[in-house]
Regions:
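Glycosyltransferase catalytic domains, chiefly GT-A lineage
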Residues: 1-190
C-alpha cells in the first residue's frame, strides 16, 4: 500500500487514531472550562516557536506517525517537510522535530496525502494487537481483525524495567482470536 499511496507525488502515511484508542491528547483542567492543552503536536509546536495560530490548528489534529511513510523522490512533499524541519530544528528539540515538521506539512501546508489504515503502521503501545493462531500472525484487536503489516514499538513495550525494543527476550501476554492468552514478543522474527 505504501508504494501505491505515494503515486503522483502524494505522501503515504498513517495517523495515530483508530478504534479502541482511549486517549488522543492530554489536557490539564485548571478550573471550570479552562484547560491547558498537552497534545503532542501542540506541545512540540510551542517549544519549536511555531506561530500560535498554526500551533492551535495542530493542537487537536490527529497526530501523524512518521515511523513509516512513502514519498516519491520528486514529490513536492520533500520540500515542504525540509522547510518545516529546518524551522522545527532551529528552536525546538531534536526529538519530535521530524514528526512535527511532517504534521505541519500535512495540516498547514496541505500537501497531498493518502492516509493509510492503522494496520500499515500499528503502534503497539497505544493498543496491543491480538494473535491469530490459525494464520500465526498479529491482527487488529477489533473486527474485522485485519492482519498487521508493520508493528511499531514506539514508546516501548515494557515488562517491569525491560523494554522489548532493547531486549529480545521480553515477551508479553497477548490475547488470541480464540480468547486464549499467549506469551509473545512483538518484535519481527524470521
Amino acid at each position: 500500500l505504501y508504494f501505491k499511496a505515494c503515486n503522483n507525488g502524494k505522501l503515504g502515511i498513517t495517523q495515530t487514531l483508530g478504534p479502541g484508542y482511549k486517549i488522543m491528547s492530554k489536557v490539564k483542567w485548571l478550573f471550570g472550562k479552562l484547560a491547558i492543552i498537552k497534545s503532542q503536536n501542540f506541545k512540540h509546536a510551542i517549544s519549536s516557536k511555531i506561530d500560535l495560530d498554526k500551533a492551535r490548528k495542530l493542537a487537536f489534529a490527529p497526530h501523524i506517525n512518521i515511523g513509516v511513510f512513502s514519498l516519491e523522490r520528486d514529490s513536492p512533499g520533500w520540500k515542504s517537510w525540509q522547510k518545516n524541519l529546518e524551522k522545527t530544528l532551529k528552536s525546538g528539540k531534536i526529538f519530535g522535530s521530524e514528526g512535527l515538521a511532517m504534521n505541519i506539512s500535512v495540516y498547514i501546508d496541505n500537501i497531498e496525502t493518502e492516509f493509510l489504515p492503522l494496520n500499515c503502521n500499528w503502534i503497539a503501545s497505544n493498543l496491543l494487537p491480538k494473535f491469530d493462531e490459525n494464520q500465526q500472525t498479529f491482527v487488529e484487536p477489533y473486527l474485522p481483525n485485519y492482519k498487521i503489516g508493520i508493528m511499531h514499538l514506539a514508546a516501548g513495550i515494557w515488562d517491569g524495567d525491560k523494554d522489548m525494543r532493547l531486549n529480545k527476550d521480553v515477551k508479553i501476554n497477548v490475547k488470541t482470536l480464540r480468547n486464549n492468552i499467549q506469551s509473545k514478543s512483538l518484535r519481527f522474527s524470521n
